[in-house]
């Protein structure tokens, strides 16, 4: 396949690009403000918020749109420039160069759900960050329909792995004794190892699964405290204490704390019909990083 990966310098994007290359695919990747160490990738230096960038005159079998600001970006205007305006600019550059776009989103689009979330659950975002991301998704979905382009979306749980927030915000802080959970940490979360996130994206592309949505997280329900405590036990650190929500919001921002502390349980039945998880539980995933 000929493939374009936006955000190819990022946590998921870099691993996806490497995996695609290792399987013999021709990979182009947009990079912005992060040097790439990926050999054999055709690098496109592009700031998607500036519509002056150019995409090579190539017919891509699939475009993976992963470039995005995270909830750690507190500036709402910057979020919109990157996550919405950047998506619009990208589509205008690729609408004649591909027949399939895969969009990476998150479980936050389901807001504060009642019961178990699956692909039929109502979309009801309750943070500005997620509302912007959903606006970008709707733009892509509508524009793809108008231009006869296949579109699929993967709603990922919290993606963790070596070199991610998991190491910087959990492992290192546990080791230093500085780790705190917002509140008691007793809210159910849905996690997915980055290798499985990459595997799912690959499977959707290789099987040409167009015009689909997938809820993507491993099969184990766990509270955030249980996740952090298991990590602490693996590295021989003390269990983290909690801090009041208002203090957590002051440090991390309201959107991130709301996304982190909203309880979430999912069914991964649909994606499990087309993809076999490498790490069916968070314990196996954490072990793969820390052992």
Where are these regions (language model features)?
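Mid/C-terminal beta-alpha module of Rossmann-like enzyme folds, strongest
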Residues: 204-255, 290
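N-terminal Rossmann NAD(P)H-binding glycine-rich loop of SDR-like oxidoreductase domains
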Residues: 3-23
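C-terminal amphipathic/interface module of NAD(P)-dependent oxidoreductases
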Residues: 238, 257-291
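Substrate-positioning beta->alpha
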Residues: 162-171, 182-205, 212
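Active-site Tyr-X1-5-Lys
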Residues: 127-152
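Conserved Rossmann-fold NAD(P)-dependent oxidoreductase catalytic core, especially the SDR/UDP-sugar
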Residues: 88-128
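Glycine/proline-rich active-site loop of Rossmann-fold NAD(P)-dependent oxidoreductases
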Residues: 134, 147-149, 159-169, 204-214, ...
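NAD(P)H-binding glycine-rich loop region in Rossmannoid oxidoreductase-like domains
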Residues: 45-89, 93
């Amino acid at each position: 396949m000929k493939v374009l990966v936006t955000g190819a310098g990022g946590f998921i994007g870099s691993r996806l690009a490497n995996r695609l290359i290792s399987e013999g695919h021709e990979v182009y990747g947009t990079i912005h403000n992060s040097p790439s160490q990926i050999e054999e990738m055709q690098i496109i230096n592009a700031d998607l918020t500036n519509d002056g960038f150019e995409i090579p005159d190539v017919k891509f079998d699939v475009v993976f749109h992963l470039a995005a600001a995270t909830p750690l970006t507190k500036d709402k205007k910057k979020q919109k420039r990157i996550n919405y305006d950047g998506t619009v600019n990208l589509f205008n550059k690729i609408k004649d160069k591909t027949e399939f776009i895969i969009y990476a989103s998150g479980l936050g689009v389901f807001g504060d759900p009642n019961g178990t979330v699956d692909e039929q659950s109502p979309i009801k975002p309750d943070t500005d960050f997620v509302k912007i991301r959903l606006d970008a998704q709707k733009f892509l979905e509508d524009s793809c329909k108008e231009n006869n382009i296949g579109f699929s979306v993967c709603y990922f749980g919290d993606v963790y792995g070596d070199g991610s927030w998991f190491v910087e915000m959990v492992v290192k802080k546990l080791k230093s004794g500085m780790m705190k959970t917002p509140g008691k940490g007793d809210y159910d979360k849905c996690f997915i190892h980055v290798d499985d996130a990459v595997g799912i994206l690959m499977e959707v592309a290789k099987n040409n699964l167009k015009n689909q949505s997938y809820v993507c997280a491993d099969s184990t329900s766990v509270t955030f405290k249980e996740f952090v405590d298991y990590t602490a036990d693996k590295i021989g650190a003390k269990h983290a204490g909690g801090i009041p929500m208002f203090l957590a919001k002051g440090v991390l921002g309201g959107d991130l704390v709301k996304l982190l502390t909203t309880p979430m349980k999912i069914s991964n039945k649909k994606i499990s019909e087309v993809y076999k998880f490498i790490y069916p539980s968070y314990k196996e995933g954490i072990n793969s990083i820390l052992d």
